[in-house]
Each structure stands twice: as structure tokens, then as C-alpha cells.
Amino acid sequence: MTKYVLALDQGTTSSRAILFSREGDIIQISQKEFTQIYPQPGWVEHNANEIFDTESWGMRDCLKQAGIDGSQVVAAGITNQRETTVVWDKASGAPVYNAIVWQDRRTAGFCDELKARGLADTFRQKTGLVLDAYFSGTKVRWILENVPGARAKAEKGELLFGTIDTWLIWNLTKGKVHATDESNASRTLLFNINTGQWDDELLGILGVPRSMLPTVTRSSEVVGEIHPEFLGKAIPIAGNAGDQQAATYGNACLKPGMAKNTYGTGCFMLMNTGKEVHASKNNLLTTMAWATPSGRYFALEGSVFIAGAVVQWLRDGLGIIKDAPEVEQLALSVPDNGGVYLVPAFAGLGAPHWDQYARGTMVGITRGSTKAHIARAALESIALQTLDIMDCMQKDAGIKLAALRADGGATRNNLLMQFQADVLGVPVERPKVTETTALGAAYLAGLAVGFWKSEEEIEAMWQLDRRFEPNMSAETREKLVYDWQRAVERAKAWAQE
């Protein structure tokens, strides 16, 4: 009987379940979108129950479509949108408020207060993160301060907190296991990456009771079992990593100095820095990559908030394309951007600027500008934001990148991949399996149960689909980068009164 590993890939806009073979091939994908909730400008929420319902539907549908039963699944791995925060009642399992999504900016003012109190360095040294509304800690505090009765219940030990992985594990195990892994814990502003523990000083500053926190486990170990009622058999939950760390693992960036960029809703570049903590001097994040039996691994990370989401905006906001793949043909209908630059700072700017008051800006528009120029500028903005991060990463790590491995939905766009190689000046490698986030979760789970024997075996399975070589003149590149930087300066601090 053929055996498989199941990956549960819980993303920002959809929940997916993907079944992988021993060769690392995709056997089946099931996917369901869920509701995006925007209560007011800058606020983004999800219904936590809907997240679990779509994910549990996905895993059942995945096995059904593949024509296999639970007895053929040796392990499940979880990967998730990071930082998104759920607080729920320990007794009933009911969320006390909607999940507050990583994109949500409601705690920006509180982050400013913490900076004004001189606490930025404390958080940076302990967590590797910057004080920004992006991370979970200030979101937990907001729920405790603003949901009636939540603070009192939390102080009595009646509420639990978790990122999405923790929420899924809690529900899949029917409330038996309250756990997260080091990669997810390292995104909360509550976890000390140097000690590998929750940090009492940080918990005190943010007013989060320790009793709310999940147990922190390795990214590759059996933490519990999916209850038999879901798939007809108890299946070990053996892998867990935040989406970007999982993608780094799935792209086999297992040696220090290797880097990948994931092109999804946002854009996320991670460089494996091995077992050393590299503090960034260029406004990148230092984060946990993963913790496996071979040790604790760290990464430098640059986060772009809006990448693929800018294409959704062209479709839903401006109506200039009917579906996302159309953007490539539209952008190819003009030879260049016609001097138009789009800075998609719809939710502020992430690394390396960390400007929560920046807003979306389009510059260089003339009477001759068309929707094709705007489409091209939108695609180019994804690659140019990535360039800003790579420059900082190379300075921090003291390593010149040899190539960038790319994954995520937007890597199917050949124009974007070629432009990315051109502006970076290094080759961009697209793997055969671009579902590397789910693959990473599957690898971590499979390793824990012996389905795969070693990381060397995983490295050998990585296969190249296409390598994009840079072929832009230095003069053209310099002009593009110079104008892009001017456009970014105009977007900064726009919403600051």
C-alpha cells in the first residue's frame, strides 16, 4: 500500500491540503477560499472557525479526490500564515474575537508608544524583530484590552492564545494539544530567540499572561495526533513551521548562505544563516528558521507586505484585468514601464523601511500612460521591493548571493521572473515543485517519522524547472533603481498627520 504525507497549508486567503508522494511529487491539492473581513481602514480579520472548517474540509476532500484513506497517510505537517492571532476560551474552544491578521495595522499607535518608551532595542535584541503592528504580541494585547471581560478571563487562566498553527493543532487534536513550533513562536514579539523560551520581561511589557501561551516544540517532531473522526484514523502531526520558514525548507535552502523568495500575497525573502544569530544592521528581521533534531537554525528575513496582492488590486480595485494571469500579457504589450512607478504601500512599507504610515503611490503618469504601463509597474514593484531586501541581506550576512530560489504562485509569471533576475543581477531559479511551502511542511513531518531518512535525501530531491539569467544593461538597471528609490521616498509617511 502506497504511503503519503499530508501538508495542511493555511494561507492568508485560502486553506489548502496537499498530498505528497515519497518522491516529493504532488498527488492531490484541495483548496477553499475564506472570507476577508475589513471592519475599518487598516483592519484585517478572519473568522477563526471558518479557517478551521475550510482546512478540515480540505484535508478530507484531498484524500477523497486522491482515492486514498487515512491509513495511507504516515504523517501530517502544518504550515500557516504567520503572526495572525487567535484568542479563544479554554473550556468552550470558542474564539473571543475574530483572528487579527498579520496585515492588520490597528496596533501601530501602541507600537509608537513602545518606541517612545525606548523599548525598541529590548525587543530587537531578544526577538530579532522590529516593533511593528505586523507581529502577534500587540494583537494579543489589543484583544485583552478591547474585548469585554477578556483581560479578567486571561488573568484567571481561562483564555488561550495561538498563531494559526496552534489553533489548527488544538482543533485537530480536540483540545488535547496546545503547541506551536519555534519558527512560529519567533514571530510573536514574546519569544526570546537566544534562549528558545517565552520571555517574561516581554510578556510583562505587553501584558500577556504566561498561562495563555502554547508549549514550544521543534519544527520536526510528533506533537499529537489528528483525531480519528477527521480522516478515519489517528495521524501523527509531525511537522510545523510558519509559511516562509517552511518554504525555505521546501526549497532545500538547507545550507548557510542559501536564500529563497516566496511570491505570494506578500513577498518574503529568507537566507539561511545556520546556527548563528545574525543581528541585522539594515532593518531586516532575525528569525528562527526551524528547529530539528540536528539543531536550531536561524535566518535573516525581509518582508514585503504587498506583492501578489497588487495584482489582485489591479483586478478587484481597478478592474483593468479579469484574472491574475492576464497581467503578464498586458504588461508585455508595452516595451517598458513608460516612466510609471507604483509603490504598493497599501499597508505601509515592510523591510527595510518599516514605515507603517507609508501609503500606495503612483508616480510618473503622463497623458500617454496606459493600463499596460500600470500593469507593468505593478509587476516591477514586486521585483524592486525584493531588490531592496537583497541588498540589505548581503550586507548583513557578508555573503554575495550566488542565485535566488523562487517559489509561490507569481513565479509562473515569466516576465516577473526575468525582470527579477535583471534587477538583482543574479540568476533566479524556479523549482519544478513551486508549492514549496507545503512541501517544506511535508518534509519536516516525513523526517520526524522516518518517511525520509535525512536532509541530504531531501536536498537531492530538489529539481530545477527554469533558470532565469540576468541580461539587462547596467545603465538601464541603475536608472530603474534610482527612479524606484525616488518613488519610495514619496510614499513614505503619507498617512502621518
UniProtKB/Swiss-Prot annotation:
InterPro entries: ATPase_NBD (IPR043129), Carb_kinase_FGGY (IPR000577), Carb_kinase_FGGY_CS (IPR018483), FGGY_C (IPR018485), FGGY_N (IPR018484), Glycerol_kin (IPR005999). Its EC number is 2.7.1.30. PROSITE patterns: FGGY_KINASES_1, FGGY_KINASES_2. One of its GO terms (biological process) is glycerol metabolic process. Keywords: ATP-binding, Glycerol metabolism, Kinase, Nucleotide-binding, Transferase. Gene3D superfamilies: 3.30.420.40. Disulfide bonds: none annotated. CDD domains: FGGY_EcGK_like. ATP binds at T12, T13, S14, T265, G308, Q312, G409. Sn-glycerol 3-phosphate binds at T12, R82, E83, Y134, D243. One of its GO terms (molecular function) is glycerol kinase activity. ADP binds at T12, R16, T265, G308, G409, N413. It is an enzyme of class 2 (transferase). Glycerol binds at R82, E83, Y134, D243, Q244. Pathway: Polyol metabolism; glycerol degradation via glycerol kinase pathway; sn-glycerol 3-phosphate from glycerol: step 1/1. It catalyses: glycerol + ATP = sn-glycerol 3-phosphate + ADP + H(+). Belongs to the FGGY kinase family. PANTHER family: GLYCEROL KINASE, SUGAR KINASE. Key enzyme in the regulation of glycerol uptake and metabolism. Catalyzes the phosphorylation of glycerol to yield sn-glycerol 3-phosphate. HAMAP family: Glycerol_kin. This is Glycerol kinase. It comes from Nitratidesulfovibrio vulgaris (strain DSM 19637 / Miyazaki F) (Desulfovibrio vulgaris). The gene is glpK.
